Amino acid sequence: MSNILEVKNVFKQYGDYTALNKVSLSVPQGSIYGLLGPNGAGKTSLIRIINQITMPDSGEIILDGAVLKPEDVQYIGYMPEERGLYKSMKVGEQCLYLAQLKGLSKHDAKTQLDYWFDRLEIQGWWNKKIQELSKGMAQKIQFVVTVLHKPKLLILDEPFSGFDPVNANLIKDEIIELNKQGTSVIFSTHRMESVEEMCDHIALIHKSNKLIEGKLTDVKKQFRTNSYEVGILSDNIEGLMYDLSQKFTLTQTDFKSLNDELKLEINLGNATPNELLNTLILRGQVTHFMEKIPSVNDIFIKTVTE
């Protein structure tokens, strides 16, 4: 698979502070790529360099196979965490202006705006001023001006900030639909549940360094702990616990009195899943048996606290 974006050994320093320490990333064409990290990790510095707001001290950015050039701004859609709409301008006037900055003719801009205003059901906002809109309403306008020029690469920094759950879900669906149509997406957020739902690749930056990068499924495999979540109905709990203790490590126990189901989290150690399952079957009725796959949140916390 080719890459829509390659970041090669990017180094950025502000005075004595190193914001990015020779960071390299590869964003596959057509992916939704989660850029993760705690506050101050270097994510925003990297995003600003990709958008040519600031320049790296060394290293280079490759967009769609060629070194990034100033005119490539037309191929990128960027929605920063700090939204940047002019509060005193009318919505329609501002959208037309920003669209033309991205290279669209006035006619094409109006066509795209009509499409998006209709799609998001905001037709009545055209003559309103930004200052008359709620934060969530202004967020919708910011999203529209970010995507209306049909960018190859969409960079979204905390895109769900300010949205209620209904509108957050609406924007999420629009991002997924744009991706299905071929737009590659870089998605920076602290909402780990959104990363789980949407991203197929992730990278984690911490203290100016890239610590993790890869397909989400592969990264999760790297962090597996060989633990299983099981549920069992047994009339001999004491015998079951003894049998399990001979070969496995119990890391969590939860007894559900409603149906007398015992829920366990068990680390296999050097044993196999079949050995665990056979041990359980001998002592009761197995109701649940599943490997515990780490969540993105688990991986994030483990990586930044080690």
PLM region spans:
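ABC transporter nucleotide-binding domain
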Residues: 173-267
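Conserved protein kinase catalytic domain
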Residues: 76-77, 117, 220, 297-301
